[in-house]
Amino acid sequence: MLSILSIAALLIATVQAADFSSSCPIDSPISCSSNGDTSNSCCYENPGGIILFTQFWDYNPASGPADSFTIHSIWNDYCSGGYPQFCDTSLEIDSTGSTIESIVVDQFGDQTLYDNMNKYWTDINGNNKKFWAHEFNKHGTCLNTLNPSCYSNYKQNENVYDYYSLVYQLFQKLPTYQWLVSAGIKPSTTATYTLSQIQSALKSKFGAEVYIACDSNNAINEVWYFYNIKGSILQQNYLPIDTVSKTNCPSSGIKFPPKGNSGANTLTTKTTGTTTSGSGSTSVPATSYINLTGKSGCLISNGKYYTSGTCATYHFNAGSSGNTQITSSKGNCGIDSSNQFTCSSSTSATDFQVSGGSIGYNGNFDWCLGAVTGSGSTAQTSVKLSDGSCSSFKLTLSS
């Protein structure tokens, strides 16, 4: 028998869905499509019409249950590439996350959601609330169909609660760990898998090609699911589409380490590309932000310098002859014909050197600022190898 709380939660969800079903027409257009009435910003996600749901496999240090991936976030990409972030400061919540429990539990009475967030939406450094606040401020404020103006009877913080509820509801529909295990892909300190095996296992359940990210040990690190969406995101009419990002994983030899296992006896080292039997640490992390010495800001996913917003997470993989290859969500990172650091799906894998926490290319560890695009807080500046004629700095790794 359903508990009183369960019945109440079901009624709330039903009323909310009915409210938005009546607000948005049945023939609401699909995001990234020009068919239908695309003028209603409360019933059409635009221009960020590609919806991503992303999950982590944090095995060392371990985060979340041993038999589950954990939540990263929901966010939207532009249909033409790139993504919005921190779209409306007036909608942001306290960056420490100090108000989230009060919103979810005290204001909206959803202790179950809050408990599940603490179980499955975990920060690797243990600061869950700050992580959740960051994700809402960066991504939740960019979902135009979640804007308070779209609610017929808006209650304060309702969009915040709905964002966290939507994230967890979609997570429940994407049991990545169970899908992999059912296909014979199980956490192991010795077994490896092919990219085709992993992609096929997930595609057979999801219905479209999924993005797989690997760390520098060639171990599964993250999984991204891509959608278009019909109508308001609150209606949850998600339409799976193939990934628009290029994997950084090898075609074979991909590892799926059990959580809590360092993998030191079986995983490839980050510095030499060889196998170690010890537990000694290596100097290049699996993932990192890239900062500029003496400057605020950091590099974003296309390789440009940005003074506001959030730093991109870069992945570091063993290259040839002890070098390191770098990737971002945009693809491989390399040096273009103008000696600029760049990352894209069309960039070839490039060998960099990482020494003392700094990044170099062909022995040159000095970098300079180049051309600027945009203006003000949205300005992006290219970063290029120093030729000795400019004020140089180092590109350094940071967590």
UniProtKB/Swiss-Prot annotation:
CDD domains for the chain: RNase_T2_euk
A GO cellular component annotation in the UniProt record: vacuolar lumen
Protein name: Ribonuclease T2-like 1-A
Bilayer-crossing regions: none
Residue numbers annotated as active site: 72, 135, 139
Annotated EC: 4.6.1.19
Family annotation (InterPro entries): Ribonuclease_T2_eukaryotic, RNase_T2-like, RNase_T2-like_sf, RNase_T2_His_AS_2
Residues carrying sugar: 291
Keywords recorded for this protein, A-Z: Cytoplasm, Disulfide bond, Endonuclease, Glycoprotein, Hydrolase, Lyase, Nuclease, Signal, Vacuole
Cystine bridges: 24-43, 32-79, 42-150, 87-142, 214-249
Organism from which the protein derives: Candida albicans (strain SC5314 / ATCC MYA-2876) (Yeast)
Span list, region Disordered: 259-279
Family as reported in the entry's similarity comment: Belongs to the RNase T2 family.
Molecular function via GO: ribonuclease T2 activity; RNA binding; RNA endonuclease activity
Pfam families linked: Ribonuclease_T2, RNaseT2L_C
Subcellular location: Vacuole lumen; Cytoplasm
Signal sequence region: 1-17
